[in-house]
């Protein structure tokens, strides 16, 4: 019988959310260097791939380790156009061909990430505004080299005004963690302290996100990712959308409990690797 694979949590401590390291230590072997990885290990490379993902995944492969998501999954999650196309009508329409935009908007613009701290750096009312904003974003050193994408603006149910003047306001949006085809945790995307309590109380609970909607989204992207997040939101007309897909090795916890996320990941890893 082959020995069970050792799950290794390769991490950068300063980049982890509160409580994350203690939660990971309950289930995984902790490591801060790729030199600690042994042949046969299953590696959860948390916040470790940037800025040279190909180098990291190549090195770990040469060490004889298997990396959750791998380079293919890492690249897929970073490619908004790829996963948007796979999701189809489950996600807002997205394009990098600004000449094809209808004049009437509005649109949301983003590179690999959106500047949610400055709504004026995300929102464009018309196609002309989108073209001008793209030029500004391309000149921004923080987005230089990113593919700037325009997305159909979806007005989500509000959870209150922006806690910071000029920032993106909180809305009914949830971060759903998925590990190997199973939802292991779901919670508010926005910090609850930034939201109005009455609106949070009136909003759907995470377990009220339609199961069929989540299953459809997971079927679209789950062949490319093993451990990932779906940010899903409810619009003002009552329709659910996938707003974002993120690599679970990079996504923040939002309001999810790391203990729940990593217990779920450990359970699913044990299932797929045969570890008892």
Identify the meaning behind each predicted range.
Residues 2-9, 39-43, 65-66:
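Hydrophobic beta-strand segments of well-ordered beta-sheets in folded domains
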Residues 185-242, 261-275:
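A long amphipathic alpha-helix within ATP-dependent nucleotide-binding catalytic cores
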Residues 48, 112, 153-154, 177, ...:
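Anionic group-transfer/hydrolysis microenvironments
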Residues 169, 224-226, 246-249:
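Donor nucleotide-activated moiety binding/catalytic core segment of transferases
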Residues 161-166, 172-189, 241-246:
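Beta-strand scaffold of nucleotide-dependent catalytic cores
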Residues 42-44, 110, 238-254:
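A short beta-strand motif that forms the metal-chelation/ATP-contact edge
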Residues 19, 34-38, 46-50, 55-172, ...:
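Active-site nucleotide/adenylate-binding loops and adjacent lid/helix of ATP-dependent enzymes
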Residues 1-31:
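Short, charged N-terminal beta->alpha structural module
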């Amino acid at each position: 019988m082959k020995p069970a694979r050792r799950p290794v949590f390769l991490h950068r401590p300063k980049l982890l959310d509160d409580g994350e390291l203690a939660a990971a230590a309950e289930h995984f072997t902790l490591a801060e260097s790729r030199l600690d990885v042994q042949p046969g290990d299953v590696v959860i490379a948390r916040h470790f791939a940037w800025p040279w993902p190909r180098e990291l995944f190549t090195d770990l492969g040469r060490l004889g380790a298997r990396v959750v998501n791998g380079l293919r999954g890492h690249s897929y999650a970073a490619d908004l156009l790829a996963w948007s196309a796979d999701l189809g009508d489950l996600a807002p329409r997205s394009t990098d061909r600004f000449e094809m935009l209808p004049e009437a908007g509005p649109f949301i613009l983003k590179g690999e990430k959106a500047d949610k701290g400055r709504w004026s750096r995300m929102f464009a009312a018309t196609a002309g505004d989108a073209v001008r904003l793209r030029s500004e974003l391309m000149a921004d050193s923080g987005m230089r080299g990113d593919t700037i994408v325009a997305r159909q603006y979806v007005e989500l149910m509000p959870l209150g005004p922006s806690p910071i003047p000029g920032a993106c306001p909180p809305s009914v949006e949830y971060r759903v963690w998925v590990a190997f085809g199973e939802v292991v945790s779901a919670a508010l995307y926005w910090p609850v302290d930034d939201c109005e309590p009455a609106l949070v109380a009136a909003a759907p609970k995470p377990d009220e996100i339609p199961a069929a909607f989540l299953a459809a989204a997971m079927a679209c992207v789950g062949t490319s990712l093993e451990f990932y997040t779906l940010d899903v939101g409810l619009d003002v007309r009552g329709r659910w959308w996938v707003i974002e897909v993120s690599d679970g090795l990079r996504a923040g916890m939002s309001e999810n409990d790391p203990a729940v996320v990593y217990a779920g990941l450990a359970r699913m890893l044990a299932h797929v690797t045969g570890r008892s």
